[in-house]
Regions:
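C-terminal motif of bacterial Sec signal peptides marking the signal peptidase cleavage site
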Residues: 7-10
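Bacterial signal peptide processing site
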Residues: 12-15
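Contiguous segments within soluble domain cores/interaction surfaces
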Residues: 18-163
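Thiol-/selenol-based redox modules, centered on thioredoxin-like
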Residues: 140-141, 148-159, 269-292
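Short active-site neighborhood of thiol/selenol oxidoreductases, capturing the structured segment around
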Residues: 159-162, 171, 179-200
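Residue-level recognition of beta-strand->loop/alpha-helix junctions
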Residues: 194, 226-228
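Typically the conserved alpha-helix immediately C-terminal to a functionally engaged Cys/Sec
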Residues: 201-218
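Thioredoxin-like thiol-disulfide oxidoreductase module
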Residues: 219, 229-257, 262-269, 287-291
Length: 292
């Protein structure tokens, strides 16, 4: 699996995501750069994740981040197509100190740019800009699509140690149902694809923990499932096997982790979260689905 390039870069590795050109900044902590972490942006509404870094690649942390979007392949690439305010994602985990998310809709394919104005406290505002591409269609299940009715391994086929790399293992309720079984129930479903022990972005464990906390509040009204990215995590933890991606991950055509999907009671994708999504952000979408 390919971890979110922006986080790998923020932690000292990685070269950026395909089609993305990082802001060229001098190696100065007083400057700023931004990186787009999403690998599957397409026409229509999207949740976008950005790494907000100083000039030497360290996370700037919680800041007021305002974004402007430009369609560089459009008739007038200088026209601002939309403006949004980004949301800081790092209050719950140190691994997400660089990360901010926003909701934005794209009306054309091709090359786009995002410009960030970053202000922390009373300090001087910093600006940074980067480019990314928008596809016609998402490669992975998108909002409005029917969720794949995957028949994944569960506690009926395997002990929990083979179903998750989380140690100690967490709530067994996350491993009792297949996705197909959960979709047959008349209630929503949250599916977390993550590998807590082997995540390149260091946010898979916190992502699963966020879902487990939400299950304590909403587990009587909806289903929760965790899909470990790799087969036999018990043997991977002791270096006895090479990593093999689970069939469920291939079913959903995922290329990054963590990836979280919220499915409504009709079996359609109501929301999706590439990369880390804190519990409060997930909860907003859950509340909307439960109220619909």
């Amino acid at each position: 699996m390919i971890g979110l390039a922006l986080v790998a870069a923020a932690c000292g590795g990685g070269d950026g995501s395909p089609g993305e050109t990082p802001t060229q900044a001098s190696p100065d902590a007083a400057s700023a750069q931004i990186r787009v972490g999403d690998t599957d942006l397409s026409l229509g509404p999207n949740r976008m994740v950005l790494a907000v870094l100083d000039g030497v690649g360290s996370p700037i942390g919680e800041s007021d981040v305002r974004l402007r979007f430009y369609h560089l392949d459009g008739a007038d690439p200088a026209v601002v197509k939309s403006e949004t305010v980004a949301r800081f994602l790092g209050r719950q985990t140190q691994a997400a100190q660089a990360l901010h998310s926003t909701r934005v809709s794209f009306d054309a394919v091709g090359l786009w740019a995002v410009e960030a104005t970053i202000r922390r406290g009373a300090g001087e505002a910093l600006t940074a800009r980067t480019q990314f591409r928008i596809k016609t269609n998402s490669d992975t299940p998108n909002i409005g699509d029917l969720a794949p009715a995957t028949v994944n391994d569960t506690l009926s086929t395997s002990p929990i140690e083979r179903l998750t790399s989380q140690r100690p293992t967490g709530d067994p309720a996350f491993y009792r149902l297949t996705i197909a079984e959960a979709l047959a129930l008349p209630k929503p479903l949250l599916v977390v694809f993550s590998t807590p022990a082997f995540c390149q972005t260091r946010t898979c464990g916190p992502q699963l923990e966020a879902a487990q906390a939400l299950a304590e509040r909403y587990g009587d009204r909806m289903s929760f499932i965790h899909i470990e990215i790799f087969e036999r995590p018990d043997l991977l933890l002791t270096n006895e096997v090479d990593p093999t991606t689970r069939a469920a991950v291939r079913d959903w055509r995922l290329q990054t982790e963590p990836m979280t999907y919220l499915i409504d009671a009709a079996g359609k994708v109501a929301d999706r979260f590439e990369g880390f999504a804190p519990a409060d952000e997930l909860e907003e979408s859950i509340a909307a689905v439960l109220a619909s």
